[in-house]
């Protein structure tokens, strides 16, 4: 009897201990489940906030970011030949600069565009500095051997304007090597801040509308017939549709640099096709972006 009672007490104790352990384990599991649920909710909220932040279109605030800028005045010795003209000095200047927008991907994109070399491949900042220093040293050597008025190679980026998700930049370039004057120009960059990509000519225009596009540009070039074809700087056959363009409130601006369709004295030329006039030439995908309204000639 005593032995049976002891066995019963042991079993009761075991069940009691096991029951307590089950309750504690259950409580622990419930607490862990709540913690996991809370962390999951917080993670989802952070992900949502991040996605919203990424969709926010930043306002561009651009500052010059000089990569290389060096200049000096080189004094030339007087020529020993009376009939030979040698300038007393020549100015040497090499510079390249990009922009700092505090938007990392945009800064990288702009640097890649301004750093492209002859084969179209972008160079690193370090490579640019090395290349410009080498070119500077070679130019200085040439000037000392054959005195000229100067050499100037300038390349920089400028911020033009922004409308929502569209930002427009331009690359300015100027080159002078001792002639009567230097030659400069502009190349525009249209950047979609939402897709983080450059807008190319093919992104904007339908491929089967080239002839119509050329006709519209030619009309504006000749001022709707005011300038006769034979009087134009460029003949109609030689006239080309440039892929150097930018988007603005009044339409699409096609930019022709000096000597392309006008003389040096006349400078760069811009031909504008109004949005309402260009709508039939534009790709549906481009129109869906709604960078600017295209259905009215009073687009803002």
Regions flagged by a language model, labelled:
Residues 21-300:
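Compositionally biased intrinsically disordered regions enriched in Thr/Gly
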Residues 6-11:
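Sec-dependent N-terminal signal peptides
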Residues 1-4:
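Positively charged n-region of N-terminal signal peptides that target proteins for export
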Residues 16-19:
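C-terminal motif of bacterial Sec signal peptides marking the signal peptidase cleavage site
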């Amino acid at each position: 009897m005593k032995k049976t009672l002891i066995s019963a007490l042991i079993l009761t104790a075991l069940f009691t201990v096991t029951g307590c352990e089950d309750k504690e384990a259950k409580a622990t599991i419930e607490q862990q489940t709540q913690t996991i649920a809370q962390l999951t909710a917080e993670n989802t909220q952070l992900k949502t906030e991040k996605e919203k932040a990424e969709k926010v279109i930043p306002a561009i605030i651009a500052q010059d970011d000089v990569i290389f800028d060096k200049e000096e005045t080189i004094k030339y010795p007087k020529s020993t030949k009376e009939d030979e003209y040698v300038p007393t000095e020549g100015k040497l200047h090499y510079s390249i600069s990009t922009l700092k927008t505090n938007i990392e991907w945009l800064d990288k994109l702009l640097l890649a565009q301004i750093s492209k070399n002859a084969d179209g491949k972008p160079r690193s900042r370090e490579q640019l500095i090395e290349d410009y220093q080498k070119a500077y040293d070679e130019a200085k050597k040439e000037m000392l051997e054959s005195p000229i008025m100067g050499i100037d190679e300038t390349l920089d980026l400028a911020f033009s304007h922004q409308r929502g998700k569209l930002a427009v930049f331009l690359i300015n370039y100027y080159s002078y090597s001792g002639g009567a004057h230097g030659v400069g120009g502009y190349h525009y960059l249209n950047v979609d801040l939402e897709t983080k990509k450059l807008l190319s000519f093919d992104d904007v225009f339908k491929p089967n509308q080239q002839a119509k596009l050329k006709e519209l540009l030619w009309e504006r070039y000749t001022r709707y017939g005011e300038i006769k074809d034979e009087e134009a700087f460029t003949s109609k056959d030689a006239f080309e549709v440039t892929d150097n363009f930018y988007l603005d409130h009044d339409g699409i601006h096609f930019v022709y640099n000096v000597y392309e369709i006008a003389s040096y004295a006349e400078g760069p030329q811009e031909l504008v096709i109004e949005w309402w006039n260009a709508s039939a030439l534009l790709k549906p995908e481009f129109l869906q972006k709604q960078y600017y309204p295209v259905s009215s000639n009073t687009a803002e």
